[in-house]
From Swiss-Prot:
Biased composition regions of type Basic and acidic residues, renumbered to the chain: 45-64, 458-475, 514-524
Residue ranges, annotated region (Disordered): 1-132, 458-485, 514-632, 646-684
Keyword field: Coiled coil, Phosphoprotein
Subunit structure: Binds to the C-terminal coiled coil region of syntaxin family members STX1A, STX3A and STX4A. Has a preference for STX1A.
Keyword hit for Coiled coil: yes
Function: Promotes motor nerve regeneration. May be involved in intracellular vesicle traffic.
Gene: TXLNB
Family the entry assigns: Belongs to the taxilin family.
Designated name of the protein: Beta-taxilin
Amino acid sequence: MEANHSEQLSAERQSTPPGDSSSLPSHNGLEKEDGQDSPTPVQPPEKEASVHPDISEELNRQLEDIINTYGSAASTAGKEGSARASEQPENAESPDNEDGDCEETTEEAGREPVASGEPPTVKEPVSNKEQKLEKKILKGLGKEANLLMQNLNKLQTPEEKFDFLFKKYAELLDEHRTEQKKLKLLQKKQVQIQKEKDQLQGEHSRAILARSKLESLCRELQRHNKTLKEEALQRAREEEEKRKEITSHFQSTLTDIQGQIEQQSERNMKLCQENTELAEKLKSIIDQYELREEHLDKIFKHRELQQKLVDAKLEQAQEMMKEAEERHKREKEYLLNQAAEWKLQAKVLKEQETVLQAQLTLYSGRFEEFQSTLTKSNEVFATFKQEMDKTTKKMKKLEKDTATWKARFENCNKALLDMIEEKALRAKEYECFVMKIGRLENLCRALQEERNELHKKIRDAEISEKDDQSQHNSDEEPESNVSVDQEIDAEEVNSVQTAVKNLATAFMIIHHPESTPHQSKETQPEIGSSQESADAALKEPEQPPLIPSRDSESPLPPLTPQAEAEGGSDAEPPSKASNSPAGLGAETQCEGLPVGAQADQASWKPEAEASGQAPQAPTEASLQKMEADVPAPACAAEEHVAAMVPACEPSRQPPRAAAEELPVGASAGPQPRNVADTNLEGVD
């Protein structure tokens, strides 16, 4: 079908004049679209094409007979007529969507053989076709223009649009050039065809002779054309009915569209009303805005006035500030002068402070000599230092403070004298304790020897008694032995308890708040009473034990007359025995002193020996008085108690009563007690 359509276009271009050929190349792009749209309406002519070839064959046969009869000249004319006859059914098959196309093709097919000698009748259908083609081309151009505009709208930048148009123009130029070449070829063909036409016109005269024979053929063709016309009329009627249906449908759609348009018009009216209302609201808002602007202008004016007032106040304040600054400068100068004066005064005070510090160093050098022994004087020194720090701040009161310090210095000297006296007493006490410890060691050794001898004797006696009475009194011996052993144990326990009590009373130290050498006389009757209580304790062996010993179960022998004799011989020198109550009096005096003085007493011994020889006279006098007051039996009782002490040594447990009754001063001077402990351990 496309080939037939292209042949029709070529025939139309041959019929068109050369002046109109320039308008055709630009429409080649739409010819393909027409060729694509053509197959849909071409379906009914295909049935006609199946009928035409039979008639054409019969006509060809008849023409061959005519050509054979009329010779070679007529044969060429017959061939041309057959070619044109073959072109007629092809022209009838061309696709035309319009209603009058089928009728025109049938009329042309019937008129061409009749009016073959009249050329103007042939050009009329060609011109009609050209007009239709031009209309189609214009329609196609509108579609192409729309497509171009759409493609251009898709692009964003003008450069891209320009590139797209340039490409399109290049394509159209190529097509135009190809079509011009085709046009030249067609023009050449047209010249040839015109030459042939001239020849055919010469031969046309010859063809008239064959007209008679061809009339019959024409009649048959007319009959055939009538049938075709009837069919075409039927088709036209059907198409008219279809058109009517389409028009009715189109009218219904138009009515719907009109209804929609009316609805839209109503909506538009509503929108217009809303727009008018909004415009009125906007006007009211604008009026309010103008009123607010006027109000704001008034407010701004009021604020400007306030700002002017504030500026005036600021100027006044600045003037006041300037005056205040001037005053401040004056005060600053005055204060600087005062500061310079105060600095000078401070320098003077610092010089005075250096002088006073020199004096303080002198005093501190004097007091450092006493710091090694007087631990309690550290507190006095601390208070003294605090007062000296205060004196740096209170320079006006230095004279009064110096007077007070002088008085305190005298008091300290008196206290030092007292301490020297106490030191002498303690030295004598120490000697007494050393003597006592030596005696106790000797007694312990003697008692241990006696104990061992007694144990041996008891064992020998038991063995002999067992051997004698083993045969006769086997049942009575255990009872008698048990009774004897119990009596011995009870005696030993009582003797140990009395010895412990005597030791406690012998080492008793009475506490007194004040330590003066005058109180030693007051302590003497107390010591005598304690010695009397010790003697009473010796006479009362039946008292319950106060301090249990670990080795109380072990039998201890009673004291022998030899031990008592030894104790008496050791107690003969009365001067040594008289030192013990003097030592107790000294201990009572030491407890009146602070703890620091007792702790630093050891360091004062060489100094007291070197510098304290002069004040020993009153201490010796007091000792002689104490020796005269204390009776000799007291010393003997103490030695007797000391002789009983070694019985308690195996227990290795110190008496609790003595430990609890010892004062703080006894713990401050631990040297003589340590020596005694080491000696006792050696005895054990």
